[in-house]
Amino acid sequence: VYRNGKSKANRCFVMIIKKNDASSNRIGISVSKKVGNSIVRHRVTRVIREVMRLHWKEIKSGYDIVIVARPSAKESDYGKFESAIFHLLNLHHLLLEDDDLE
């Protein structure tokens, strides 16, 4: 995914996507030591995972998605995480249209 994927970024995250041959999505989350100590890194990881879990059905299937947290992510709250992730999903055209849901 890192080598051949398409990358988009905003202040909090870098999102890299690549089409896969599966019918479902796979997600990877990377939070380096630059973001903070282990407590901060695990919090960032948990919040990213929760945002993706709650909105999983709104994302087109068949992609490998890697989310890399930037150091500015440690200062963000859940609302900023959610809007930043949706911004990147929208840039990658991965959000389903309203009529495609269900």
List PLM regions with ranges:
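Positively charged, solvent-exposed patches that mediate nucleic-acid binding
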Residues: 1-102
